[in-house]
A protein has these predicted regions:
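N-terminal beta1-alpha1 cap of cysteine-dependent amidohydrolase-like domains
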Residues: 1-83, 195-235
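Amide-donor transfer/coupling interface in amidating biosynthetic enzymes
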Residues: 2-3, 9, 122-235
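Structural motif
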Residues: 55-59, 89, 188
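Short, solvent-exposed coil/turn elements at secondary-structure transition points
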Residues: 13, 46, 119-121, 150
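Cysteine-nucleophile active-site neighborhood
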Residues: 62-139
């Protein structure tokens, strides 16, 4: 790829509660290890959100921050980027706000961005703990940590990211986690997810048309060891 790859970390001051920015760091690292020029753009709430990124990231956050974030994202920059071939990775609150609606404080229901056919409602008990899935993608087991009160249901046909082996995932009764479309991978997995799951990180990078099939193997044994340790810890 001749041009610099742009990784856009959307609204980190609002959606950066659980250290999910580590996903952005690991994407940049994996590109740099392959000699692929890249830059991370921390797109602040006080700036115009860029529409020319290659990869976008939405992290987790608290209720009021999530509401503020979805209002800022209604400006269409993310939507335009996805239409132009960008890829989005979204975690927890970032996952929820991509749907039709999600719950907020004071019993409010907030309209989402309608980028995914999902709806999230408040539920009890809160889902907290290790989350282990078998991915629906050809990358094996996925490991992470979930911490969410919302329960997410699909409102139309949609591929989950993983089938839950341990934990709750999207919904207490449905035993799946996240969602996958041509432009979006979403999950409830913190960890950060792309640090714990190097195969998922490379799969995500490979989805961009300019990078597909061009990612050579790299020395990342420390991340593969972390993945194996976290999977083994759930057994």
């Amino acid at each position: 790829m001749s041009q610099r790859v742009k990784i856009v970390n959307l609204l980190p001051e609002l959606l950066g509660t659980y250290g999910d920015q580590g996903n952005v760091v690991t994407l940049s690292w994996r590109l740099s290890k392959r000699g692929i020029d890249n830059e991370v753009i921390n797109a602040s709430a006080f700036e115009k959100l860029p529409a020319d990124g290659d990869f976008y990231f939405l992290g987790g956050g608290e209720d009021d921050a999530q509401v503020a974030a979805v209002e800022l994202l209604r400006n269409g920059a993310l939507q335009s980027a996805l239409k132009n071939g960008a890829q989005l990775f979204a975690v927890c609150a970032g996952f929820q706000l991509l749907g039709e609606s999600f719950p907020a404080s004071n019993n409010r229901t907030i309209s989402g961005l309608n980028l995914l056919p999902i709806k999230t409602e408040s539920a009890s008990p809160r889902s907290v703990g290790e989350l282990l899935c078998e991915s629906t993608l050809p990358i094996g087991a996925l490991t992470g940590f979930e911490n969410h009160g919302g329960q997410t249901k699909f409102t139309d046909r949609l591929q989950p990211l993983g089938i839950v082996q341990l934990g709750n995932g999207n919904h207490l009764s449905e035993k799946c986690d996240g969602a996958v479309t041509d432009q979006i991978i979403a999950t409830y997995m913190h960890g950060p997810a792309l640090v714990r799951n190097p195969a998922l990180a490379d799969y995500f990078l490979n989805r961009h048309g300019d990078l597909a099939g061009k990612l050579n193997e790299i020395e990342d044994s420390v991340f593969k060891k972390l993945h194996a340790e976290r999977v083994a810890a759930t057994k």
